[in-house]
Amino acid sequence: MLDLKKLRSNTEEVKKALSNRGEDFDVNVIDEVIALDEERRKILVDVEALKKQRNEVSAEIPKRKKAGEDVTEVMAEMREIGDKIKADDAKVAELNDKINYIMLRIPNIPNPAVPEGETDEDNVEIKRWGEPTKFNFEPKAHWDLGTDLDLLDFERGGKVAGSRFTVYKGMGARLERSIINYFLDKHTFENGYTEVLPPYMVNRDSMTGTGQLPKFEEDAFKVENNGYFLIPTAEVPVTNMYRNETLEGDKLPIKHAAYSACFRAEAGSAGRDTRGLIRQHQFNKVELVKFCKPEQSYEELDKLVQDAESVLQGLGLPYRIVRICKGDLGFTAALKYDIEVWMPSYNRYVEISSCSNFEDFQARRANIKYKNSPKEKPQFVHTLNGSGVAIGRTVAAILENYQQEDGSVVIPEALKEYMRCDLLK
């Protein structure tokens, strides 16, 4: 959520910044919310004047009674003032609802470093690590490797649940679990994160706090009989752990790493991404979430990207980093980087992590603040999160990049102690 004061004082600047944002968003609603806010503020001024008048009249009543005067008219005036205040309070409540409705649907303001552009083709590559894997044979896609090696069962996943659900079997299940443990160990032992194992279901306030609601409700899995939502990412429960709290400034930054299953109703509809593990309704991920002071947040974003990189480097998987343009930025981020792993079957890089700085956008929605001393006025924290990284896509990348001509797959060195083997065959 944006700062309403900033909308009032920098209206045209904000409208310009939000143009070409890539969201289905009409910047003219900013004028609407400012008009509603002006109406609300005028009524609040009237209410204060009425309350002052009521206090003055109220003070007259005991004086008149003491003097033996009739207070009938004064009491009637008191009731009339009270009715006006009650009516104005109702108008303010109605305006608050209208303002909040709009404010929850206004996307974040892009950082000036965000490139101009409309689609992912306009994202700017800023780094590559490793070289795309070359083969002296025709490589297989991960879905064929997973089936041939009896690691993945797409047919039974479909039978049990439906399309885009997968059963991991035998060494495939062990590979998934080994990657999870490797990522968590890397982030907690080496990168300084505190591990969290969060709930996989959250309430509406939590989904609103991180920005999934109200805009993306149709993309979420909702438990109809009680109003819970299955989490699309551990970002939601971990960020909302601190909702409506004021944190101690000297404890910042707070850094959490969380493994969870993730659930996405909208999983894509066309192209090769619909095959295999790339777009699933249920998948596993290790998420990195940070809470920090505003002056720390962009340095912490750089570190967050490096932490996500570290697990891919540890696995020897080639990747690149792109800075996301305005039109591809999404609803909540002020600045975002995608890390894309090389996928031979696609002959291109495929997103495996997104690392974002939300500045105070989520903190305002979730009311997460900090202060440096007990007497200091609380300020909103900045929140950041990044995939550290997606597990299923890592499985796919390992199968494709480490495959051998005979159809076997070499286990990356970093996973051998977890897998207790050197080769999948």
From Swiss-Prot:
GO terms for cellular component: cytoplasm. Its EC number is 6.1.1.11. It catalyses: tRNA(Ser) + L-serine + ATP = L-seryl-tRNA(Ser) + AMP + diphosphate + H(+); tRNA(Sec) + L-serine + ATP = L-seryl-tRNA(Sec) + AMP + diphosphate + H(+). CDD domains: SerRS_core. PROSITE patterns: AA_TRNA_LIGASE_II. Pathway: Aminoacyl-tRNA biosynthesis; selenocysteinyl-tRNA(Sec) biosynthesis; L-seryl-tRNA(Sec) from L-serine and tRNA(Sec): step 1/1. L-serine binds at T233, A234, E235, E287, S387. Its main location: cytoplasm. Belongs to the class-II aminoacyl-tRNA synthetase family. Type-1 seryl-tRNA synthetase subfamily. Catalyzes the attachment of serine to tRNA(Ser). Is also able to aminoacylate tRNA(Sec) with serine, to form the misacylated tRNA L-seryl-tRNA(Sec), which will be further converted into selenocysteinyl-tRNA(Sec). NCBIfam families: serS. Homodimer. The tRNA molecule binds across the dimer. This is Serine--tRNA ligase. The lineage of its organism: Bacteria, Bacillati, Bacillota, Clostridia, Eubacteriales. The gene is serS.
